[in-house]
UniProtKB/Swiss-Prot annotation:
Subunit-level organization: Found in a complex with at least ARL2, PPP2CB, PPP2R1A, PPP2R2A, PPP2R5E and TBCD. Interacts with PPP2CB. Part of a supercomplex made of cofactors A to E. Cofactors A and D function by capturing and stabilizing tubulin in a quasi-native conformation. Cofactor E binds to the cofactor D-tubulin complex; interaction with cofactor C then causes the release of tubulin polypeptides that are committed to the native state. Interacts with ARL2; interaction is enhanced with the GDP-bound form of ARL2. Does not interact with ARL3, ARL4A and ARL4D. Interacts with beta tubulin. Interacts with TBCE.
Family: Belongs to the TBCD family.
Gene Ontology MF terms in the entry: beta-tubulin binding; GTPase activator activity; protein-folding chaperone binding
Extent of the signal sequence: none
Protein name: Tubulin-specific chaperone D
Expression induction or repression: Down-regulated by shear stress.
Pfam families: ARM_TBCD (PF23579), TFCD_C (PF12612)
Keywords: Cell junction, Cell membrane, Chaperone, Cytoplasm, Cytoskeleton, Disease variant, GTPase activation, Membrane, Neurodegeneration, Repeat, Tight junction
Summary of the function given for this chain in its UniProt record: Tubulin-folding protein implicated in the first step of the tubulin folding pathway and required for tubulin complex assembly. Involved in the regulation of microtubule polymerization or depolymerization, it modulates microtubule dynamics by capturing GTP-bound beta-tubulin (TUBB). Its ability to interact with beta tubulin is regulated via its interaction with ARL2. Acts as a GTPase-activating protein (GAP) for ARL2. Induces microtubule disruption in absence of ARL2. Increases degradation of beta tubulin, when overexpressed in polarized cells.
Disease link: Encephalopathy, progressive, early-onset, with brain atrophy and thin corpus callosum: An autosomal recessive disease with neurodevelopmental and neurodegenerative features. PEBAT is characterized by early-onset cortical atrophy, hypomyelination, microcephaly, thin corpus callosum, delayed psychomotor development, developmental regression, intellectual disability, seizures, optic atrophy, muscle weakness and atrophy, spastic quadriplegia, and respiratory insufficiency due to hypotonia.
GO process annotations (BP): adherens junction assembly; bicellular tight junction assembly; cell morphogenesis involved in neuron differentiation; microtubule cytoskeleton organization; mitotic cell cycle; negative regulation of cell-substrate adhesion; negative regulation of microtubule polymerization; post-chaperonin tubulin folding pathway
Domain of life: Eukaryota
Length: 1192
C-alpha cells in the first residue's frame, strides 16, 4: 500500500442545501445495488483519470445521498461494499491515488449510515493492529486532499484497539540496536491520537473516538489515563477560544474528554472528575461565541456530573406500565388496565452524600438551558434529565423548581425554550411526579401561546414548538387519571395551537401532540373526529386552518369558547396584520356557532379595545367588530329579524361612534392612519351590509368623507398597502351607497346622486394618478340606481381616463382601473334597448368597444418595465366580459368588424413574449371561441379555429410555457384574417431577450415557413404581411428592432431562398428600402447591429438589390462608432465567404485581405481610404461626403 506517493486529487464532501419544498424518502430497498457494485469494481480503471474519477465519485455520492433519510436500507449491503473497498486498501500493489479514492468512497458510506454502525464491520483481528497503525503513521496531516483517508484510518484503528489482549504482547523486543529503543505500540497510538486531536479537519472527530476506546482499555488506563488527562487539561488551560487554533485545540480536547467520561468506567474516571470540572470552570466556555465549544462544554459537564453520582434508577420516579410487553399483556389478562405508580416514601440511598461537584454541574446545566443556540440548550436539557434520574427525590424536586424558574416573563425566549426541553426530558423519564403537574401544566399552557415582538420580527416559534413536545412527552409518560384534571385545558390549548398558530411547524407539532394524547390518553373530547380533520397535512394551510378547520372544531362545545377567547385575547392584537385579518374573519365564522356568547361577552370586549393606544389592537378589534356584527346579522336575517335583536343599543351606539372617536383623536393621520382607514372602511362595508339603523344619521356623512379622503390621498399611502386600501374603500362605498342612498326602491336621492357623480367625475382629471385610480374604481362600484340617468356622462369620463395623452402617458394604472370600471358598470346596468343613459345599448356600445380596443395598443414602458401590460390585460378582460354580456342578451349588437378586431387583437397578445400575459390572452381567446350560450357571432374562421383549438385541449395546454404555446399559435398564420396580428406578436417574441421564448417562437415560425415553401402564393402573402408590419412600425423601436432580428433569422435560415432566383424581386427591393429608412441617422447600437446582419443577408438577392446592400455596408464601414465599423467588416468578411458568387474570384482574395487586415477602429481618414478601395473592388460607387448645412 504505497500511501506515501502523491495524494490523489479530491475535495471535501459536498453538502447541498435545498431551499425548495423537500420531499420525504419513501424507498423500500437499496435499488442501486448492481450499479454500485459495478461502480466499485471500476475504481482500479478510473482512479487515474481526472474526469472519470470525479464522475464516479459524484455518481456514488448521489446514490448514497438518496438514502440519507433511510440509511438502514443500506445495512444488508454494507459488508460487501466495505470488503470491495478494503480489498483495494489492503492490496500492496494499489497506488496511492487508488487507495485514497477507496477511502473517499468509504467516507461517503460512513457519512450516510453513521460511523457507529459502520465501525463494527472493520477487520479487527490482532494482525490488523500494526498494518493499520503503520498506515496512519505515514499519513501527512497537512494533506488537504486526503483527509477522508486519515479519518477512516483513525476510525479503523479505534476498532482494533478493542482487541482483548494486552498491547505489550505485540511489542516484542523494543531494543533494535544497543542504546536504541523503538516506541511501543501503546505509545505510538497515544502519540498519533494526541497529534490528530489538534488538526483542523474531520480527522479530529475520529481521533476523539480513538482516544475514548484506547484510554479506557484496562491495560492502558493504569499507565496512560492520568498522563493523557494531564495533557488534555494543560491544552485547555493554554488555549483561548478567541483564536482559531485555540478553538480547534479546545474542540478536539473537549470531544476526547467527553467520550472518555462516557465510555470509561465510573470508578476509573471518578478520581479525575473534580479536577476536570475545575479546569472546565476556568475555561469560561459560556462566554465563547463558538456554539460547538459551548455544546461540548455542556456535554462534558453532564458526563462529569453522572460520574459523581452512582448509576442507579431512582426508586421514587413515576412509572407507567412496564418495559416488558409480556408483563403489560399479563396485566391486561388479569383485568387491570393500568399499573399504579410506585413511589417509595423511603429511599435506600436517601442518606447518601451528594458530592459537592454535583451542585456546580447542575448550576452550569441550568445556565446552558438559557444558551443562545438550540443545540446547547438541547444538550443541557438532556443533561438535566439524566442527572435528576440519579438524585434523591428532594434534590430532584429542587431541580424541577429551578427549571420552572425559566418560565418568567423577565426571562428571554431562549430560557423558555430550554425550560420546555428540560421539562419534556424530565417528564419522559418519569422524574416529574404528579404532584408537580399543576405547576408544570400552567407554564406549558403559557408557552403554547408564547409570542413576543422583537423589532421587525417575533420570537417564540421555538418555544411553542417545544411546548408541543412537552405535551407529546406527557401523553406517553402519565396514566390517564393523572392528566384527567388537565385534559380540558391541554386539549383546548393544543387545538388552538394546531389551528391558530402563525407558524406551520408549530401547527403541525400541536397536531402531532394532540394525536399522541388522543391515542395514549383516550380522554381528549372528540379526539378522533378532530384528528381526521386537523391532521398533519390539513394544518399546513394557514387560511384553511383559520377559516375552515376552526369552524368544524368549534362545532364541539368544549372548544368553542376557548377558541373565541384566544382569538380575542391573542390574535386580534397580533403584530402580523395578516393574522389580525384572519382572526377577524375566523371570529365571523365562530360567532355563528356561539351567537349569544359573541354578542354578550365578546362584543363589549372588542368595542373597548377599539380605543386602545396600541395600534395593532385597535386595528384588529375594529376588523373583528365589523366581522362579528355581520355574522350576527346573517343569523338574524335567516329568521327575518334585524341585527339589533342580537346587539343591544349600547353596542350599536359603540359601533356608530368608532369613526368619530378616531377622527377626534386624529388617528387617521400618519403611518398608523393607513391601518385605521383600512379597518374603518371594512367596518363601513360590513355595517352597511348588516343594515344597521343609521339611515339619515350624521355618521353616514362621516363615513362618506373617510372614503372620499382615502381615495383622494391614495398617493400618500405606502405602495405595498395601496391596493388593499383602494379595494377596501371601493367595497365600502358600494355597500354604503346600496344601503343608505336609495330613496325609493330603484331610485336614488337626487341631491346625493348629483353630488357624488359630479365630484367623482371631477376627480378623474386629478393630476395624481392614484387619485384617478381610486375614483375610477369608485364610479365602477356605484350601484345601478345611482348611475340611472347619468350613465353616458360617467362612461365619457372613464373613457377620458383610458385615453393616452402626452401629459399622462405614464398613468398606466389609472388607465387599467378605468377599464375595469367600464366593464363593471356594464355588468351593473346590463344590456337593454333604450336610452344610452340607462343601460348598454346600440347607441353607446360602439363607443365602449372603441375605448376598450384602443387600450389594446398600450405598450407604455417606464422604470418598472412594460407597464402597458396591465392596461392590455384589463382591456382583454373587459372586452371578454362585455362581449359575453352582449352575447347573452343582445348578440345583434356585436358587429362583424368589432368581433374581428377583438379576436385579432387578443390573438396578437397570445403570441407575445410575456409568459403569464400570453396565458391570460389565450384564455380570453379560447373563452370567446368556445362560448356557446349562445355562440358569439361573426368570429372569423370559427370552423378552422375549433379544429385548431378543440375544447378537449383547453385544460391540458399550458399557454405560459413557450414550448406549448408557440407551436399552436403559429397555426393562425395560415388564416388571412389573423396573419398580420399573430405575425406582429411573433416578431416581438422572436426578437426578445428570453432564451426559451426566442427558441420556441423561432422554431415554430420556421416550421410554418417550411410548410409553405412549395406554395408561392402563401409565401408571397406571408412576405407581404411581413413588409406591411415593417412599414406600419417604421421607426417604432419596440417592433422594428425585433423585426430586424427576425428578418436576420429567416434570411439566414433560407426561408426566402425562392426569391433569390429572380433579380430585384419586389420583396427584396421593398425590404431594402425599409431597412435603409429604419437605420438612417440612427444612434441605437442594437438597431444598427441588426441592420448590418440584414444587409449582409440581402447580398444573396441578385441585381441592384445586391449592389445597394453592398453600398449600405460600405457606408457603415465608415460609421462614426468604431464598434459598428468593426462589426460590419467582420460580418461582410463572413458573408463573402458564404456567398462566393457575390464577388469575382479574381478580386475575392484582395477584398478579404482588406477586410481582415484593416484596423477598422482606427481614425476615419485611414479607414475611409480602405473603404474606398473596397468600393472599387466590389464595383459599387464610392460614397461622397455631404457638406453640413451652413458650413463655411
Amino acid at each position: 500500500m504505497a500511501l506515501s506517493d502523491e495524494p490523489a486529487a479530491g475535495g471535501p464532501e459536498e453538502e447541498a442545501e435545498d431551499e425548495t419544498l423537500a420531499f420525504g424518502a419513501a424507498l423500500e430497498a437499496f435499488g442501486e445495488s448492481a450499479e454500485t457494485r459495478a461502480l466499485l469494481g471500476r475504481l482500479r480503471e478510473v482512479h487515474g483519470g481526472g474526469a472519470e474519477r470525479e464522475v464516479a465519485l459524484e455518481r456514488f455520492r448521489v446514490i448514497m445521498d438518496k438514502y440519507q433519510e433511510q440509511p438502514h436500507l443500506l445495512d444488508p449491503h454494507l459488508e460487501w461494499m466495505m470488503n470491495l473497498l478494503l480489498d483495494i486498501v489492503q492490496d500492496q500493489t494499489s497506488p496511492a491515488s487508488l487507495v485514497h479514492l477507496a477511502f473517499k468512497f468509504l467516507y461517503i458510506i460512513t457519512k450516510v449510515r453513521g460511523y457507529k454502525t459502520f465501525l463494527r464491520l472493520f477487520p479487527h483481528e490482532v494482525a490488523d493492529v500494526e498494518p493499520v497503525l503503520d498506515l496512519v503513521t505515514i499519513q501527512n496531516p497537512k494533506d488537504h486532499e486526503a483527509w477522508e483517508t486519515r479519518y477512516m484510518l483513525l476510525l479503523w484503528l479505534s476498532v482494533t484497539c478493542l482487541i482483548p489482549f494486552d498491547f505489550s504482547r505485540l511489542d516484542g523486543n523494543l531494543l533494535t540496536q544497543p542504546g536504541q529503543a523503538r516506541m511501543s505500540i501503546m505509545d505510538r497510538i497515544l502519540q498519533i491520537a494526541e497529534s490528530y486531536l489538534i488538526v483542523s479537519d474531520k480527522a479530529r472527530d475520529a481521533a476523539a473516538v480513538l482516544v475514548s476506546r484506547f484510554i479506557t482499555r484496562p491495560d492502558v488506563k493504569q499507565s496512560k489515563m492520568a498522563e493523557f488527562l494531564d495533557w488534555s487539561l494543560c491544552n485547555l488551560a493554554r488555549s483561548s477560544f478567541q483564536t482559531m487554533q485555540g478553538v480547534i485545540t479546545m474542540d478536539g480536547t473537549l470531544q476526547a474528554l467527553a467520550q472518555i467520561f462516557k465510555h470509561g468506567k465510573r470508578e476509573d474516571c471518578l478520581p479525575y472528575a473534580a479536577t476536570v470540572l475545575r479546569c472546565l470552570d476556568g475555561c469560561r466556555l459560556p462566554e465563547s461565541n463558538q456554539t460547538l465549544l459551548r455544546k461540548l462544554g455542556v456535554k462534558l459537564v453532564q458526563r462529569l456530573g453522572l460520574t459523581f453520582l452512582k448509576p442507579k434508577v431512582a426508586a421514587w420516579r413515576y412509572q407507567r406500565g412496564c418495559r416488558s410487553l409480556a408483563a403489560n399483556l399479563q396485566l391486561l389478562t388479569q383485568g387491570q388496565s393500568e399499573q399504579k405508580p410506585l413511589i417509595l416514601t423511603e429511599d435506600d440511598d436517601e442518606d447518601d452524600d451528594v458530592p459537592e461537584g454535583v451542585e456546580r454541574v447542575i448550576e452550569q446545566l441550568l445556565v446552558g438551558l438559557k444558551d443562545k443556540d438550540t443545540v446547547v440548550r438541547w444538550s443541557a436539557a438532556k443533561g438535566i434529565g439524566r442527572m435528576a434520574g440519579r438524585l434523591p427525590r428532594a434534590l430532584a424536586d429542587d431541580v424541577v423548581g429551578s427549571v420552572l424558574d425559566c418560565f418568567s416573563f423577565q426571562e428571554t425566549d431562549k430560557a423558555w425554550h430550554g425550560g420546555c426541553l428540560a421539562l419534556a426530558e424530565l417528564g419522559r423519564r418519569g422524574l416529574l411526579l404528579p404532584s408537580r403537574l399543576v405547576d408544570v401544566v400552567a407554564v406549558i399552557l403559557k408557552a403554547l401561546t408564547y409570542d413576543e415582538k422583537r423589532g421587525a420580527c417575533s420570537v417564540g416559534t421555538n418555544v411553542r414548538d417545544a411546548a408541543c413536545y412537552v405535551c407529546w412527552a406527557f401523553a406517553r409518560a402519565y396514566e390517564p387519571q393523572e392528566l384527567k384534571p388537565f385534559v380540558t385545558a391541554i386539549s383546548s390549548a393544543l387545538v388552538i395551537a394546531a389551528v391558530f398558530d402563525r407558524d406551520i411547524n408549530c401547527r403541525r407539532a400541536a397536531s402531532a401532540a394532540f394525536q399522541e394524547n388522543v391515542g395514549r390518553q383516550g380522554t381528549f373530547p372528540h379526539g378522533i373526529d378532530i384528528l381526521t380533520t386537523a391532521d398533519y397535512f390539513a394544518v399546513g394551510n394557514r387560511s384553511n386552518c383559520f377559516l375552515v378547520i376552526s369552524v368544524f372544531i368549534a362545532g364541539f362545545p368544549e372548544y368553542t369558547q376557548p377558541m373565541i377567547d384566544h382569538l380575542v385575547t391573542m390574535k386580534i392584537s397580533h403584530w402580523d396584520g395578516v393574522i389580525r385579518e384572519l382572526a377577524a374573519r375566523a371570529l365571523h365564522n365562530l360567532a355563528q356557532q356561539a351567537p349569544e356568547f359573541s354578542a354578550t361577552q365578546v362584543f363589549p370586549r372588542l368595542l373597548s379595545m377599539t380605543l386602545s393606544p396600541d395600534l395593532h389592537m385597535r386595528h384588529g378589534s375594529i376588523l373583528a367588530c365589523a366581522e362579528v356584527a355581520y355574522a350576527l346579522y346573517k343569523l338574524a336575517a335567516q329568521e327575518n329579524r334585524p341585527v339589533t335583536d342580537h346587539l343591544d343599543e349600547q353596542a350599536v351606539q359603540g359601533l356608530k361612534q368608532i369613526h368619530q372617536q378616531l377622527y377626534d383623536r386624529q388617528l387617521y393621520r400618519g403611518l398608523g392612519g393607513q391601518l385605521m382607514r383600512q379597518a374603518v372602511c371594512v367596518l363601513i362595508e360590513k355595517l352597511s351590509l348588516s343594515k344597521m339603523p343609521f339611515r339619515g344619521d350624521t355618521v353616514i356623512d362621516g363615513w362618506q368623507w373617510l372614503i372620499n379622503d382615502t381615495l383622494r390621498h391614495l398617493h400618500l399611502i405606502s405602495s405595498h398597502s395601496r391596493q388593499q386600501m383602494k379595494d377596501a374603500a371601493v367595497s365600502a362605498l358600494a355597500a354604503l351607497c346600496s344601503e343608505y342612498y336609495m330613496k325609493e326602491p330603484g331610485e336614488a336621492d337626487p341631491a346625493i346622486q348629483e353630488e357624488l357623480i359630479t365630484q367623482y367625475l371631477a376627480e378623474l382629471r386629478n393630476p395624481e394618478e392614484m387619485t384617478r385610480c381610486g375614483f375610477s374604481l369608485a364610479l365602477g362600484a356605484l350601484p345601478g340606481f345611482l348611475l340611472k340617468g347619468r350613465l353616458q356622462q360617467v362612461l365619457t369620463g372613464l373613457r377620458a381616463v383610458t385615453h393616452t395623452s402626452p401629459e399622462d402617458v405614464s398613468f398606466a394604472e389609472s388607465r387599467r382601473d378605468g377599464l375595469k370600471a367600464i366593464a363593471r358598470i356594464c355588468q351593473t346596468v346590463g344590456v337593454k334597448a333604450g336610452a344610452p343613459d340607462e343601460a348598454v345599448c346600440g347607441e353607446n356600445v360602439s363607443q365602449i368597444y372603441c375605448a376598450l380596443l384602443g387600450c389594446m395598443d398600450d405598450y407604455t414602458t417606464d422604470s418598472r418595465g412594460d407597464v402597458g401590460t396591465w392596461v392590455r390585460k384589463a382591456a382583454m378582460t373587459s372586452l371578454m366580459d362585455l362581449t359575453l354580456l352582449l352575447a347573452r342578451s343582445q348578440p345583434e349588437l356585436i358587429e362583424a368588424h368589432t368581433c374581428e378586431r377583438i379576436m385579432c387583437c387578443v390573438a396578437q397578445q397570445a403570441s407575445e413574449k410575456i409568459d403569464r400575459f400570453r396565458a391570460h390572452a389565450a384564455s380570453v381567446f379560447l373563452t370567446l371561441l368556445h362560448f356557446d350560450s349562445p355562440p358569439i357571432p361573426h368570429v372569423p374562421h370559427r370552423g378552422e379555429l375549433e379544429k385548431l383549438f378543440p375544447r378537449s385541449d383547453v385544460a391540458s395546454v399550458n399557454w405560459s410555457a413557450p414550448s406549448q404555446a408557440f407551436p399552436r399559435i403559429t397555426q393562425l398564420l395560415g388564416l388571412p384574417t389573423y396573419r398580420y396580428h399573430v405575425l406582429l406578436g411573433l416578431v416581438v417574441s422572436l426578437g426578445g431577450l428570453t432564451e426559451s421564448t426566442i427558441r420556441h417562437s423561432t422554431q415554430s415560425l420556421f416550421e410554418y415557413m417550411k410548410g409553405i415553401q412549395s406554395d408561392p402564393q402563401a409565401l408571397g402573402s406571408f412576405s407581404g404581411t411581413l413588409l406591411q408590419i415593417f412599414e406600419d412600425n417604421l421607426l417604432n423601436e419596440r417592433v422594428s428592432v425585433p423585426l430586424l432580428k427576425t428578418l436576420d433569422h429567416v434570411l439566414t435560415h433560407g426561408c426566402f431562398d425562392i426569391f433569390t432566383t429572380e433579380e430585384d424581386h419586389p420583396f427584396a427591393v421593398k425590404l431594402l428600402a425599409l431597412c435603409k429608412k429604419e437605420i438612417k441617422n440612427s444612434k441605437d447600437i442594437q438597431k444598427l447591429l441588426s441592420g448590418i446582419a440584414v444587409f449582409c443577408e440581402m447580398v444573396q438577392f441578385p441585381g441592384d438589390v445586391r449592389r445597394q446592400a453592398l453600398l449600405q455596408l460600405c457606408l457603415l464601414l465608415c460609421h462614426r462608432f468604431p464598434l459598428i465599423r468593426k462589426t460590419t467588416a467582420s460580418q461582410v468578411y463572413e458573408t463573402l465567404l458564404t456567398y462566393s458568387d457575390v464577388v469575382g474570384a479574381d478580386v475575392l482574395d484582395e477584398v478579404v485581405t482588406v477586410l481582415s487586415d484593416t484596423a477598422w477602429d482606427a481614425e476615419l481618414a485611414v479607414v475611409r481610404e480602405q473603404r474606398n478601395r473596397l468600393c472599387d473592388l466590389l464595383g459599387v460607387p464610392r460614397p461622397q461626403l455631404v457638406p453640413q448645412p451652413g458650413a463655411c
